């Protein structure tokens, strides 16, 4: 008995000591900016390690399942036995379908990605769900589906960062920054491009550049890139050889033209993905079998693609002979079409992954094809297919993924040629403007739109959703029966005793607001004993719902031209649950906006 008591006391002491150390760490990371920067670096190391491990696992799967040589990329157009090309995606689809069906039984909520987490939930993500997404991405890509691993990199990195930040109980904005650090580390490790990883976090995951986020995100991206360099012998996933490519001022209009055309291709790819999802959703088969059906289609497309993948990757087609150049251009056009279809089918049937890698590949093909066609029609222009491949690659990724400056830095870091920057910057801007004007969404925000979410970026709109009327309203409001006499009302509610009184009917439902200035008007003194309150009510049809956010409430106040409105539970029962004044709603709204401004400027560390 004494031994058990001693063990119990010891375990309590250990637990108490751990709690004290955790509390101390929480204070340090909340109070010290340098400590938070180091925390971001730790997140970058973890994300870079996860991305490197995932990349190696997928590479091993390619070597084992498709029978390619060690260190050879499956996307390099190497010869693969035809039966492997057909059967591996089908088998992979069956395995993925079984995994998704099994995980769905234990998952009670929808998976939240880093963009949605930062936009709505203040950076909160589930680590188990994120690891599940990473596993599904590896199964999809490893079995030959035309999807990118970047979705898995950012999901796993963001999930680990969110879990760590939640354990340390960091502030809402700091948690959003940590999720951005996880994404930055993963992308930087994948492409060995720390600047691209950092701006991926700024533009796509955090939703904007801020002083407070600069140091932790950049340190995280650098840490992820260093980890990948130490653990991986492979080059970047899409190596494109460029060397000191000159800038041609006389071809500037052609650069803008290829950017606009590439943006149109990117829009078509996104629409094709949506159409594919709808077609697979309409199939009368189990969702677990749809990846296998899509895998069969992808295998057939891959079989045709590999017959002409070598000439497609020959981006110097314009330097070939006339007949050879035509064959190269035809091969590039065929691969462009088949790769687009394969990506649309892969995502539509349920394979897990993104369009980042596909957008880079398709963009490079589009640029090389454009340069080859122009050189064939106008030999005197002598466009460099490699330069136009890089330009179009950046434009396509800016259209599909978003984040124009992410793609500028990615292209520069992948090629090592800063002379391309003056051409890439205007091209990605043209592509982004074209996509915004003609389509209005990136691939991620387009999927949010189809789901009914009003998310256009990772900007934090969750605080608006959390600041609801139910949280702002006052519940101790006075009520009166609508059939009461004015004289009784004046007796029960003397002038100055209340700011407003809500009238309800015999069933307790909202009837209107009694304006006190009207109830105590001098012209009603003689008729007070015979006048009922129903004749004096205002705002009979203007009410607030407890589920409204503060922005919707302010808009309702403006439309009703009211200083205060009653809050009802729903529009059917109309039972009064509280009252809210416009002045208080505006004060809280402005207070939250000021808090967001302070976080953006990094002032929260010193407050």
Give the role of each language-model region:
Residues 1-466, 470, 475-489, 498-501, ...:
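Alpha-helical transmembrane segments and immediately membrane-proximal extracytoplasmic
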Residues 353, 402, 430, 472, ...:
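Hydrophobic, well-ordered secondary-structure elements that form the walls
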Residues 409, 511-519, 577-585:
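Short hydrophobic beta-strand motif reused across regulatory alpha/beta modules
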Residues 454, 464-477, 484-485, 515-518, ...:
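Bateman (tandem CBS) regulatory domains
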Residues 480-498, 504-505, 521-526, 530, ...:
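The conserved cystathionine-beta-synthase
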Residues 506-509, 571-575:
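Flexible loop/coil segments at beta-strand boundaries within sensory signal-transduction domains
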Residues 582-607:
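Juxtadomain coupling helices with adjacent low-complexity linkers
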């Amino acid at each position: 008995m004494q031994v058990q008591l001693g063990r119990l006391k010891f375990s309590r002491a250990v637990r108490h000591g751990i709690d004290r150390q955790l509390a101390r760490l929480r204070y340090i990371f909340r109070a010290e900016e340098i400590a938070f920067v180091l925390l971001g670096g730790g997140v970058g190391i973890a994300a870079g390690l996860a991305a490197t491990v995932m990349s190696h696992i997928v590479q091993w799967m390619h070597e084992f399942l498709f029978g390619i040589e060690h260190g050879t990329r499956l996307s390099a157009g190497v010869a693969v036995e035809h039966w492997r090309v057909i059967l591996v995606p089908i088998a992979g689809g069956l395995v993925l379908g079984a995994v998704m069906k099994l995980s769905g039984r234990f998952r009670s909520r929808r998976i939240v990605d880093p963009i949605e987490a930062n936009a709505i939930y203040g950076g909160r993500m589930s680590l188990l769900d994120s690891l599940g997404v990473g596993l599904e991405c590896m199964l999809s890509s490893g079995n030959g589906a035309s999807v990118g691993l970047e979705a898995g990199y950012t999901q796993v990195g963001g999930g680990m960062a969110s879990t760590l930040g939640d354990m340390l109980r960091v502030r809402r904005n700091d948690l959003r920054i940590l999720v951005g650090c996880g994404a930055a580390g993963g992308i930087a490790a994948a492409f060995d491009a720390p600047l691209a990883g950092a701006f991926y976090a700024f533009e796509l995951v955090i939703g904007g550049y801020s002083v407070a986020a600069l140091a932790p995100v950049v340190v995280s991206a650098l840490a992820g890139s260093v980890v990948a360099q130490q653990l991986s012998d492979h080059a970047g996933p899409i190596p494109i050889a460029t060397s000191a490519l000159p800038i041609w001022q006389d071809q500037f209009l052609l650069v803008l033209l290829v950017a606009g055309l590439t943006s149109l291709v990117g829009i078509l790819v996104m629409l094709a993905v949506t159409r594919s999802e709808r077609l697979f959703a309409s199939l009368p088969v189990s969702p677990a079998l749809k990846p296998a059906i899509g895998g069969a289609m992808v295998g057939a497309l891959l079989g045709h693609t590999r017959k002409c993948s070598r000439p497609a990757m020959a981006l110097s087609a314009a330097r070939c002979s006339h007949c050879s150049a035509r064959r190269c251009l035809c091969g590039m056009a065929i691969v462009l079409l088949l790769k687009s279809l394969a990506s649309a089918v892969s995502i539509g049937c349920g394979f897990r992954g993104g369009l980042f890698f596909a957008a880079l590949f398709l963009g490079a093909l589009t640029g090389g094809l454009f340069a080859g066609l122009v050189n064939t029609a106008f030999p005197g222009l002598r466009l460099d297919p490699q330069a136009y491949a890089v330009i179009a690659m950046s434009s396509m990724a800016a259209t599909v993924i978003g984040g124009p400056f992410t793609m500028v830095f990615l292209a520069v870091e992948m090629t090592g040629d800063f002379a391309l920057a003056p051409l890439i910057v205007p091209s990605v801007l043209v592509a982004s403007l074209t996509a915004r004007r003609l389509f209005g969404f990136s691939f991620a925000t387009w999927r949010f739109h189809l789901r009914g979410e009003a998310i256009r970026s990772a900007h934090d709109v969750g605080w608006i959703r959390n600041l609801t009327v139910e949280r702002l309203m006052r519940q101790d409001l006075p009520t009166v029966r609508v059939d009461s006499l004015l004289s009784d009302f004046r007796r029960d509610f003397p002038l100055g005793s209340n700011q407003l009184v809500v009238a309800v009917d015999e069933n307790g439902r909202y009837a209107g607001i009694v304006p006190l200035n009207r109830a105590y008007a001098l012209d009603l003194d003689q008729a007070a004993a015979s006048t009922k309150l129903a004749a004096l009510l205002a705002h009979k049809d203007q009410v607030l719902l407890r589920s409204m956010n503060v922005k919707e409430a302010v808009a309702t106040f403006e439309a009703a031209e009211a200083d205060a409105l009653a809050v009802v539970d729903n529009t059917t029962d109309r039972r009064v649950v509280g009252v809210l004044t416009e002045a208080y709603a505006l004060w809280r709204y402005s207070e939250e906006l000021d808090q967001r401004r302070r976080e953006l400027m990094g002032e929260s560390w010193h407050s």
